[in-house]
């Protein structure tokens, strides 16, 4: 997390010992750990430790993902030391371990316990649904540009324009529409997001929003998967029609999501969902609030 963000201070007040990867004591903590849990294996301060001798043979490295992986990420995963990958759904596990995939992972290394944060999400289920959540995936190039030049907000305008147009159309049709704004982008341009005129949520408000949403519309974001396990209908729509979205769309259609090629098709899908003609697949719905307990039990074992 960003050292300057409120969560750093909050975690310190909660009793956690926090170490900056660039500060004193981190190397000793890393090398002395029996188990290392990571939520981001791409962090430039950490990524170099995941190859070569960065992790000892007697250590266990666990990738506690921050989102469901339904995109083809094998080039990234296969190049890093990953002893365990935590996942949330049967489709996700199959995509990581099946013989026809390019991943080197097997069912032995992939633990389908669910994510601990899903325990809170489960407690919110059953609320009245009244919203449509739009969740465009973040763009790392735009994020890097904003980080080096805060005035590069024109890139945000281009990225979000089709989504804001969709939001305007849905709002005009009397659907309450909410935009998911990726925290990394909001961090660099908070004023831009506040001035949108469309309700926007980031990570902290996301569980409540998902529990109240009929559907989640996304191009390639894992927020779509979060929504589907929370009982939302998934709608895959990529206004930029990128080729790698096809695989993402196909995998989600196979588990009950709706594919849309145009904004008009998104409107029709939303109408069908709100009218009850299309419902979320029940086999994806969170069954309990036991993910944290399941993961903790496995971590306490001496072997993978």
Place the predicted regions along the sequence by residue.
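A short, gly/pro- and small-residue-rich
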Residues: 48-69, 151-162, 231-243
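Conserved acidic residues
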Residues: 32-35, 83, 130, 213-215, ...
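Catalytic binding pocket for nucleotide-activated donors in carbohydrate/polymer assembly enzymes
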Residues: 107, 191-194, 222-286
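C-terminal alpha-helical cap of glycosyltransferases
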Residues: 287-304
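Active-site and donor-binding regions of nucleotide-sugar-utilizing enzymes
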Residues: 1-120
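Structural alpha-helical scaffold elements that stabilize or flank donor/cofactor-binding regions
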Residues: 28-29, 78, 208-210, 251
């Amino acid at each position: 997390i960003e050292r300057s963000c409120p969560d750093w201070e909050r975690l310190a007040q909660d009793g956690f010992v926090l170490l900056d990867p660039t500060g004193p004591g981190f190397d000793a903590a890393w090398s002395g750990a029996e188990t290392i849990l990571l939520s981001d294996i791409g962090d430039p301060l950490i990524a170099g430790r995941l190859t070569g001798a960065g992790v000892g043979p007697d250590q266990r490295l666990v990738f506690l993902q921050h989102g469901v992986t339904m995109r083809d990420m094998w080039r990234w995963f296969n190049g890093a030391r990953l002893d365990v990958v935590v996942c949330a759904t049967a489709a996700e596990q199959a995509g990581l371990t099946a013989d026809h995939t390019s991943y080197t992972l097997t069912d032995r290394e992939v633990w389908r316990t669910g994510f601990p944060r899903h325990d809170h999400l489960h407690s919110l289920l059953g609320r009245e649904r009244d919203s449509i959540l739009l969740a465009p995936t973040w763009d790392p190039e735009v994020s890097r540009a904003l980080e080096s030049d805060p005035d590069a907000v024109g890139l945000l305008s281009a990225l979000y324009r089709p989504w804001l147009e969709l939001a305007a159309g849905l709002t005009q049709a009397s659907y309450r529409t909410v935009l998911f704004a990726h925290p990394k982008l909001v961090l660099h341009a908070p004023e831009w997001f506040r001035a949108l005129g469309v309700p926007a949520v980031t990570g902290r408000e996301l569980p409540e929003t998902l529990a109240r949403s009929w559907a989640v519309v996304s191009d390639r974001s894992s927020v779509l998967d979060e929504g589907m396990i929370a009982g939302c209908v998934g709608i895959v729509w990529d206004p930029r029609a990128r080729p790698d979205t096809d695989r993402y769309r196909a995998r989600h259609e196979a588990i009950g999501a709706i594919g849309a090629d145009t904004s008009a098709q998104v409107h029709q899908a939303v109408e069908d969902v709100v009218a009850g003609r299309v419902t979320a697949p029940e086999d994806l719905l969170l069954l309990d609030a036991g993910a944290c307990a399941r993961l903790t039990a496995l971590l306490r074992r001496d072997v993978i």
